[in-house]
Every structure is written in structure tokens, then in C-alpha cells.
Amino acid sequence: MSRKTLYELQAENVRKTYLFIVTFSLILFAIGYFFVWYFNWGLTGIVLLAIFIVLYNWIAYEQSDKIALASVGAIPANPEEYYVLHNIVEEVALAAGIPKPNVYIMEESQPNAFATGKDPKHASVCVTTGLLQMMNREELQGVIAHEISHIRNRDILLMTVVAVVAGLIILLRDVMLRSMWWGMGESRRRDKNDNGAIILLIIGLIFSIIAPLIVLIIRSAISRQREYLADATGAYIVRDPYGLASALEKIGNYTRPMRVTSDATAHLFISNPFGRAEKLFATHPPIEERIKRLKSLTM
């Protein structure tokens, strides 16, 4: 099988993003239509549902990076205080042939990092304070190169949209559970032995069980191969696979989970923020395998 060019990979990521948005819109409409039917909202409910889906898709596409950054408490990195970090980001971005992304900091002891945005002109890189404290310049450069690779390969749009959508799925689960117990509205089936309420209870229970699985499946849709590709691309950008390999080794040895994160955003990070190895639906390859592949690269 022939290798894909960078432009083919970028185009594929954009297509997958649009396909994901369309698929999710259909699922969301099906769930929303049940609420419209159950609470007897009629045509008004359908119109409001359609407006909500369009608005949410716009937010997911245009504002997902801001949502992702805000959800983890990231703040802009002061150029004077974090001069070395800004310098490394600028150097790596120049070597990768993309504009310098915005630079953010997370007050977090776990060494980690992620990139977000919709394209290379509207992108951000965020690192934890723990990463800055633990890494030397070569290791930090390797981590930044990995994240810059996600930007250059246009992984970031799909990854960030998935994070926002996964967050909505979790929210829908909570709304479904609350509506089950609070019994909001009047069902058109209430006259018939509360059949509507029973149906909602059953659907709510099912959805509350499968919602976390949906989140895991969505996260795993972000192929593990993207991480391998970003590792390799980053190594070639800075002409050094050992900096990132050493950084991953230190990251892998840190097992304490991150204080502020969620299942919705876990796949964005360079390493699993929960500080544990996941086998089923894992979005990150084993760190040991990533290190092995990096050390086998020839520059």
C-alpha cells in the first residue's frame, strides 16, 4: 500500500471531521426528537431542535479550541515569564513551516501537553507547569515538536471537535437522568398508564449506561496511528528523536493522575492524563512502544 502525502493526510482529516459532524448531528436529532415527542412540543420543538444542532455544530467548529482550553483552566503563557517556552515554540513552528501557535500554560504537576485549534493559522499549544519543571530543553523541544506535528498534520480540528462533542454526550446523559427522576413536562402517553414515563425511564437508563461507552468509542476513533505519526514527524522536524523519547520516558514514569481533566478531553494530551494504562478503546499507544519506535528512527 502506497504512503499518503502530507496533503492527502490533511484532506483526509478534514473529511473525517465533516463526516463526524454529520453523523453526530443525525444521532443528536434522533435523541432530541424523542424529547420533542415525549413532551409534546410539536413543530416548535422540532424547529428549536434544528436551530440548536446548527448552533452547536458552529460552536464545535469555530469555538472548540477555546472550550477545550477553558475546560482545563489553561491561561496564556506570559512571554517574559516563559521566554524559553515561547522561543522553542517559535523555533519548531518555523522549522515545520507553520505560523507560531498561541502558547498556554496549565497549573498542573503532571507533565503533559496538547495542541488545539481548527487549522495552522488558528492553533494553540498548551503545556503543564509540571512539564516545564521536569524537562530539559531538548526534551521540551521534542514534546513541542510532537504537538506542532498535530497542528501541521491538521489532526487538531478533528481531535478538538471530538472533545466538545464528547462533552455534550456526557451532558445529554445527565439531562436524561434528571428528566427521568424529575418528570419534566407532560407526556402525551400519560393518559395510558404512564407508558411514556416508563419508556423515558427505560431509554434514560440505557443511555446513561452506554453514554460513557460512546465517549470511549469516539475517543478511540482518533487513531493511535496519529500519535505514532506525530512522534515521527516531530522527530524529523527537529532532527532529533531522542529528545521526545527521553521526555516520554519521564512522562511514563509519572503515574499520578491529572487534577483537572475529563474523558472528553483525555485524547488531546500527548499522554494519558489519568495516569493509568488503558487497553480497551485506548487512544494512546503504549509509551514503551512509542519510545522504541523513536529510537529506531534514523535522521
Curated annotation (Swiss-Prot):
GO terms for biological process: proteolysis. Binds 1 zinc ion per subunit. Its EC number is 3.4.24.-. The active site is at 147. Zn(2+) binds at residues 146, 150, 227. Gene3D superfamilies: Metalloproteases ('zincins'), catalytic domain. The keyword Lipid metabolism does not apply. The keyword Transmembrane applies. The chain crosses the membrane at residues 19-39, 41-61, 156-176, 198-218. It is a multi-pass membrane protein. One of its GO terms (cellular component) is plasma membrane. Keywords: Cell membrane, Hydrolase, Membrane, Metal-binding, Metalloprotease, Protease, Transmembrane, Transmembrane helix, Zinc. Its cofactor is Zn(2+). It is found in: Cell membrane. Belongs to the peptidase M48B family. This is Protease HtpX homolog. It comes from Thermoanaerobacter sp. (strain X514).
